[in-house]
A protein has these predicted regions:
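An extended, acidic
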Residues: 302-303, 313-335, 339, 346, ...
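Generic hydrophobic, amphipathic alpha-helix propensity
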Residues: 18-27, 43, 68-72, 76, ...
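Hydrophobic alpha-helical connector segments
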Residues: 67, 81-110, 159, 271, ...
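Helix-turn-helix
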Residues: 21, 29-63, 67, 229, ...
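Amphipathic alpha-helical packing segments from all-alpha helical-bundle domains
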Residues: 77, 124-151, 160-164, 171, ...
């Protein structure tokens, strides 16, 4: 006969294995549909259970989403602990990137499941939301510590910008890495690390951007203010978290007025994306018509978009809203994003030929630039603690000159 302890141990292992399977299925559902869009029925179907069986492990859908997010935070924490074992900031960043790339290779080969993306954290309800955001802030601080303790407030601010750009670039990998064969991942990793190590500007190229005269108006009166308010809410609460009622109340209009502008909520997020992509493309076009080197055109584009993100005119819509969209619409939005990235790649290629930009992989570097300008919205509070020009220079320096270059501190 089995000893009682062995039976209990076996039961605990079975319980844990089933719980882990439910969490993995929940992560897939969150990544496809967002936390708000995830249902018990869908998660149950993915693991071959009925809905009642799932509630044995997690009483409420919110509990399941929170557990999936906590698992992600735990994995990020462990990855950072491993990276922190290295002796220098550069070695730590290289190790952290390598851990991420190897994890994504295992996922691509089917050897591992992905964890839940964290874009819906702010759409959760308190007290769970407070606990999760505290966990996220701890991850941010630990990432910042890859560069050690800042000797001054300015150094801490710069390390914070570097941490954010590193995290966002590793999160953004899932959007563009599938365009490569899995056996190319080591080469892509090396090329991205080159950008992190030395930046995109060639030696001797200074940071002297000219802010471009970026003016964007929607053809219909009132639509620009409407889309701007919707973009802010969707960035803060996620696509599913920003209800039509909430957007309407933010603008102090009725739900009927909302439907005067757009027929459905999917149309709203598509319109917000179109507005954001149009603004980025406008900046690229304006820069290309300017005098100066290709680096000067690129640094003006980056500075203009970051200034826009940090100002009251912004933000641009975060790509995190993609997880709430129907697959076909999401694919269309990613295609537009990739066209914009290819335009950045063209600017980089011209600069490489000219000698004003380092000999880097322009396709890889262009996606790093997409992550940089896309994620800047989250750093608005950080940027508000210093002059705008300084915030833009600090944040842009992370890719202009790399994650280990301190010249922005002397500016």
């Amino acid at each position: 006969m089995n000893a009682p302890g062995n039976i209990a141990s076996g039961g605990t292992k079975r319980f844990q294995a089933k719980r882990d399977a439910i969490l993995a299925a929940a992560a897939d559902a969150i990544n496809e549909q967002s936390a708000k869009g995830m249902t018990f029925a869908d998660v149950a179907r993915r693991v071959g259970l009925n809905t009642t069986s799932v509630t044995y492990y997690f009483k409420r859908k919110e509990d399941l989403a929170a557990a999936a997010f906590e698992q992600t935070l735990g994995q990020l924490d462990a990855m950072l602990d491993t990276a922190l074992e290295e002796a220098t900031p550069e070695a730590r960043v290289a190790r952290y990137l390598n851990i991420n790339m190897e994890r994504l290779a295992r996922i691509r080969r089917g050897d591992e499941r992905d964890f839940a993306i964290l874009s819906d954290l702010r759409a959760m309800e308190d007290p769970v939301k407070g606990r999760l955001l505290t966990g996220w802030r701890n991850i941010f601080r630990k990432t910042r510590s890859l560069w050690g303790a800042g000797a001054s407030r300015a150094e801490t601010d710069l390390f914070g910008a570097r941490a954010h750009v590193l995290l966002e670039n590793t999160f953004w990998l899932t959007a563009w890495l599938p365009r490569y064969e899995v056996d190319e991942y080591p080469r892509v990793e090396a090329r991205l690390m080159e950008v992190f190590r030395s930046g995109i500007a060639a030696p001797g190229q200074d940071w002297r951007p000219e802010l471009l005269d970026l003016v964007h108006e929607e053809p219909e009166p009132g639509r620009e203010a409407f889309l701007l308010a919707a973009t802010r809410l969707i960035n803060e609460l996620g696509y599913r978290g920003a209800s039509v009622q909430r957007i309407a109340s933010e603008l102090n209009v009725t739900k009927g007025s909302f439907y005067h502008h757009l027929d459905a909520k999917d149309e709203l997020v598509i319109a917000c994306y179109k507005r954001s992509f149009d603004i980025i493309a406008d900046a690229q076009r304006l820069a290309e018509s300017h005098e100066g080197s290709h680096w000067q055109r690129l640094d003006s584009t980056i500075a203009t978009l970051l200034d826009y993100q940090f100002s009251e005119r912004g933000p641009l819509l975060r790509t995190t809203a993609l997880s709430g969209l129907p697959p076909q619409v999401r694919s269309t939005m990613i295609d537009r994003s990739n066209r914009i990235a290819r335009r950045f790649a063209g600017m980089l290629s011209d600069g490489i030929a000219e000698g004003s930009i380092r000999a880097i992989d322009p396709l890889v570097a262009s996606q790093a630039l997409m992550a940089l300008q896309n994620a800047a919205f989250d750093m608005r509070k950080w940027a508000s603690t210093m002059p705008r020009e300084k915030a833009v220079a600090f944040y842009a320096s992370t890719l202009a000159y790399g994650l280990f270059d301190d010249r922005a501190l002397k500016g």
